[in-house]
Amino acid sequence: MDPDPRRWPGLAVLLLAAFMDFVDVSIVLIAAPVIQADLGATYAGIQWMLAGYALAFGLLLITGGRLGDLVGRKRVFLIGVAAFTVASAWCGLAGSIGVLIAARVLQGAAAGMMVPQVLATIQVSFPRQERPKAYGLYGAVAGLAFSAAPVISGLLLQLDLFGLSWRPVFLVNVPVGLAAFVGAALLVRESRADVPPATDLAGIALSSAGILLLLYPLIQGNDLDWPLWAFAMMAAALPVLALFARYEARRERQGGLPLVPMSLFHQRSFSAGLLCALVVYSAVASFFFVLVIQLQAGHGLSPLQAGLITVAWPVGIGITSNLAVRLAGRLGRRLVSVGALLVIACMLLLVATIQGGEGDLDAWQVMAALLLGGLGMGMIAPILVDIVMSAVPPCDAGAASGVTNTVSQIGAAVGLAVVGALFIAFLHGQAAPAVDAVTPQLRADLATAGVPAAAQDELVAAFRRCALDRAEQQNPPSCQPQPAAQAADGASFTTAPAVRDALVRAGEAARREVFDRAAARTLWYAVGAFALAFLLSFALPPRVRRDEPQPAAVSA
C-alpha cells in the first residue's frame, strides 16, 4: 500500500484527539475537590467519578483496538471521538454526582475506542523509516498533556468562565472534539485488516474479566484501605488472564481470528518492550502523583503554579525525542538505557533538593531536575513504542496498539497503588520526626513572644498532639491548635498575636517537613523502577530493523 500523502496532517488530527484524552485524565483529578463541593458529593462518589473512567478505558482498549482492525480504524476513531465529545458535554451539564459518574463511564469507554487507533494508524500509514518520528511526536504530545493538565485546570478554575466553576474542565473538550472529528473525516485515510470480520466474544469476555479483576482493586485499594477481597481479586486475575492467553493461542492455531494474536508475544521486540513499558509507566505516573501532591498540599502552591513548574518535563521530552528518532537506527536500545539513567539522575537530584532544602523548595532546582528527566524520557518513549510495534504486521496493528495502551494503563495503576500506599504510610510515619524538627524554632518564637518555659511546654505538647492527630488523616492540613496555656492572670497565651503567629508558622513548617520527608522517601520507588528499566533495556533488540517487509492492508 502506498503511503498516505495526507499522513502528516492526519497525524496532527490524531494527536489532537490523543492530547484531549491525556489531558482529561489529570485535569479532572485536579478539579475533583471543587466538583465535590459544588455537587455535594460524598468522597465515595468522587472516587467513582475517577475510577469509572479508568475502568471503562482500561476494559475497552484491547477490544477497541481489534475492532479498528476489523471494521476500519478511521471509522472506530470517529465513533470514539464523537462519543467522547458528547460524553464531555454531558459531564459539563451534569447536575448530580450520579449523572456525572455515568457520563464519565461513557467518556472512558469512548476513549478506549479512540486512543488505540492512533498508534495503529501510524503503523499502517507511515513507511518504516518515518514511524520513529511519528512515535516521537506521539510521546511528546503525551508528555506535554500530562504536564500541561495542571496549568489548564488551574487556569479554567481560576478564570471561572461565565460563572460555570468546574464545568469548563469538561466543556473545553467539545470544540476540540468537534475539530478532531472534522479533521479526521477529511484527512485520515481508512484502513483495516485484509481478513473477514469475526467477533471473538469469548476472548473479549475473558480479557475484560481479567483486566477488571486486576484494575479495580489497584484503582480502589488505597481508598478502601486494602481489604482482603482486593488481594483475592488480583490473585483471581492471574488464572483468568492465563486462560485468556491459552484460548487465544488455540484459536490462532486453529485458523480463527483471535482478539490478541499470541504470536505477537513470540517477538522479542514486542514482549520485552511491553515489559519495559510496564515498568517505565508505573514509575512516571506515580512520580507525578507524588510531585503534584507535594507541591500543592505540602507547599501550598496553586494548581497553576505547580503546573508551570512541571512543564519543564515535556520541554525536555521535546528536545530529545526528535534527536532520539534520528539516532535510533544507529543506537537502538542504547537510547533507552541512557534515557533511564538520565531519569534516575533526575529523581536523585529531586531527592537531594527536597532533603537539602529548608522551608520552601527552590522552584528552579526542581525545574532543572524535571528538565533532565524529560530529556531522558524523550529518549525512552518514542524508541520504546517503535521497538514494541516494529514486528507487528499492519493487520494486527489495532490489537497490538490496544495491548500496548492496556499495559501502560496497568503499569500506571500498579505504580499509583504501590506509591499511594507508601506515600500515605510515610506521611503517617514521618509526622513525629517532622514535629521534632520544627519544635526548636517554635520554642524560640514562643520565648521571643514572652511565653514562660512552663507554658511553652504545654503549648508545644498540645501542638504535637494536634499535629500527630492531623497526620492520621489522608491529607493532613497545617495544625493551629488551641491549647489552654494560661498566664498568671488567667489570660490564654493563644490570644496573643505573636503566639498565634508562631503556632501558625510552626504548623505550616511541620506540614512542609512531613510532605518533604514522605516525598523524598517515596521517590526511591521511581529510582528503583527506572533502574529496573535500565536492566530490562538490555533484553530489547539491539536495533530496530528498517527493511522488514510490509504486509498489505486494505484501504477504503
Segments from the language model and where they lie:
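Transmembrane-helix bundle of Major Facilitator Superfamily
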Residues: 1-186
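Transmembrane-helix exit segments and adjacent C-terminal regions of multi-pass membrane proteins
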Residues: 1-10, 386, 442, 446-556
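MFS-fold secondary transporters
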Residues: 87-92, 107, 184, 349-351, ...
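Juxtamembrane helix-start motifs in multi-pass secondary transporters
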Residues: 73-79, 335-338, 522
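Hydrophobic transmembrane-helix bundles of small-molecule transporters
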Residues: 158-275, 283, 301, 309
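Small-residue-rich alpha-helical segments with characteristic i,i+4
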Residues: 133-142, 147, 366-465, 521-523, ...
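Interfacial helix-cap and linker-helix signal at transmembrane-aqueous boundaries
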Residues: 35-36, 67-68, 152-161, 218, ...
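Transmembrane core module of solute transporters
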Residues: 8-56, 232, 249-399, 548-549
